[in-house]
Design a protein with these regions (language model features):
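Positively charged n-region of N-terminal signal peptides that target proteins for export
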Residues: 1-4, 20
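Hydrophobic h-region of N-terminal signal peptides that target proteins for export
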Residues: 10-18
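Short glycine/proline- and aromatic-enriched beta-strand/turn motifs that initiate or cap beta-hairpins
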Residues: 19-71, 196-198, 202-208
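Residues that define the transmembrane beta-barrel architecture of outer-membrane proteins
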Residues: 30-34, 51-57, 98-104, 117, ...
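Transmembrane beta-barrel strands of outer-membrane/channel proteins
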Residues: 34-42, 74-80, 121-127, 166, ...
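Extracellular loop and loop/strand-boundary signature of outer-membrane beta-barrel proteins
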Residues: 44-48, 89-96, 145-152, 185-189
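Gram-negative (and chloroplast) outer-membrane scaffold detector with strong preference
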Residues: 60-141, 170-172, 205-208
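Predominantly the C-terminal beta-signal and adjacent terminal strand-loop region
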Residues: 81, 85, 160-208
Length: 208
């Protein structure tokens, strides 16, 4: 995991250094977006058997071609998944353990038009590391839930994140926006499939 973070940091540093030139070799101008993205979401499908909501904060760096209206960037952060609770008659309420995630995503965004108001559609492709409690995944495990302390798994999964968003430039340096996304992580080995519906707020610092 430390190796992945180091590689990501080197890529981000290279992008920042490259941004000082402001134009590609073919002359097309571009901007660099540095973004802070707090978000919240609702667990869906099998993910909702063990968790209720998901909250997190991400950092993103995006290289945006002004004429092509295409943005390519990297995003990483931390997610906290609120655990589900179970209550049986004559027994106290018991909570699952919370799940924790670290996503690393390569984003592709297309801006419908590149003005002060910038609506866009996009797709994120990447991996996510997480630690999960699957104690409530099946009826059998639910019946035995009070007899165990923790039924956990951890590891990496591959995921896709389709999204739509809106960015509003307040001036040539600062912007704010909203992003609606449907992240989907594929199951792998004993890690279950996960998807949710998320809404995020974006603050963007523009390096033009």
């Amino acid at each position: 995991m430390k190796k992945h973070i180091l590689i990501l940091a080197l890529i981000l540093t290279s992008l920042c250094a490259f941004s000082q030139r402001h134009r590609l070799p073919n002359g097309e101008p571009y901007d660099i977006f540095m973004q802070i993205k707090p978000m919240g979401g609702i667990a869906l499908g099998d993910f909702a058997k063990n968790n209720t909501y998901i909250y997190g904060s991400h950092f993103a760096l995006e290289f945006q071609l002004q004429e092509t209206k295409l943005g390519i960037g990297l995003e990483f952060g931390y997610n906290y998944c609120v655990p589900m609770a179970i209550k049986r008659p004559f027994l106290q309420t018991k909570n699952n353990w919370a799940s924790h995630q670290i996503p690393m995503i390569l984003n592709f965004n297309y801006y419908i038009f590149n003005e002060r108001i910038k609506p866009y559609v996009g797709l994120g492709i990447g991996t996510i590391w997480g630690r999960y409690d699957y104690s409530l995944s099946t009826e059998e495990s639910t019946e035995e839930y009070y007899l165990r302390d923790f039924e956990g798994q951890s590891g990496w999964r591959f995921g896709l994140t389709p999204k739509v968003g809106l960015m509003i430039s307040m001036d040539h340096r600062h912007g704010f926006g909203l992003e609606f996304s449907l992240p989907y992580q594929f199951g792998f080995n004993r890690l279950e499939t996960q998807y949710s519906i998320n809404l995020g707020l974006n603050y963007t610092y523009i390096i033009d």
